[in-house]
A protein has these predicted regions:
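Mobile-element integrase/transposase regions
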Residues: 1-51
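Conserved, well-structured core segments that form or line functional sites
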Residues: 70, 86, 90-92, 97, ...
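Active-site beta-loop-alpha junctions of metal-dependent nucleic acid enzymes
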Residues: 43-46, 63-87
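Polytopic alpha-helical membrane proteins, predominantly small-molecule transporters/carriers
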Residues: 60, 89-90, 123-124
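Short small-residue beta-strand/loop micro-motif enriched in glycine and branched aliphatics
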Residues: 60-64, 148
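C-terminal domain-tail junction helix/linker
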Residues: 148-195
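Short, acidic, Ser/Thr-enriched surface-loop or helix-capping motifs
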Residues: 55-56
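RNase H-like two-metal-ion nuclease catalytic core shared by retroviral integrases
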Residues: 95-97, 102-105, 111, 120-144, ...
Length: 195
């Protein structure tokens, strides 16, 4: 049968091997405990991408321009490099079903610490971006500095890092008007004291 003009073509379920769906994510990963991250890409019209990692409790954001675009293997190495210093605090990472996140098992392996539970990458349901709402909201704030129609090649790596720095120093109501950077490192200090 012919599809009426403007009606959406049904999409196939994402083909990401060994993916763990968001309903399997522990209830504690609700944004109230430290160490639960969300991950996303913002992409320009030219195929360039910026990786965005966000710690849910504190709103602490990390960003990096990806010179290889949306390729899964190099992206997984970048995620591991960016989170490696914080791996003992990691609990979960939630993302969408983009093929760029297909190497999620490489992320888990790269962040593994013997004797501790592995960090699991959970995948949101299709068309449910609200299931990773914290990173979607930060993406809107990022667009204040990097407008939608811009070419990411026009922005230096230093500029991207400075955008993250500005966002991490911006006071947030949910943090009692503290900022994400202060709260993120306060949580790390508390963890060190408890150890």
């Amino acid at each position: 049968r012919r599809r009426p003009k403007g009606e959406r073509q049904p999409t196939k379920a994402p083909n990401i091997p060994n993916r763990t769906s968001i309903p399997d994510r522990p209830a504690e990963a609700d944004g109230k405990r430290f160490g639960d991250f969300e991950m996303d890409l913002i992409v320009d019209a030219y195929g360039h991408a910026i990786l965005v990692l966000l710690e849910r409790m504190t709103g602490f954001v990390m960003m990096e321009k990806l010179p290889y675009g949306k390729r899964a293997k190099p992206l997984s190495k970048t995620v591991v490099r960016m989170l490696y210093a914080y791996r003992k605090y990691l609990k979960t990472i939630t993302t969408d079903n983009g093929s760029e996140f297909a190497a999620h098992l490489d992320i888990t392996a790269g962040l593994r610490i013997k004797g501790l539970d592995d960090v699991t990458v959970y995948f949101a349901d299709s068309y449910c971006s609200w299931q990773k709402g914290a990173v979607e909201n930060i993406n809107k704030l990022i667009r204040q500095y990097i407008p939608k129609k811009s070419n990411f090649n026009d922005f230096t790596d230093l500029y991207i890092k400075n955008v993250a720095k500005k966002l991490n120093l911006r006071p947030r109501k949910k943090l009692g008007f503290s900022n994400p950077k202060t709260e993120f490192f306060k949580q790390i200090a508390n963890f060190a004291l408890a150890s």
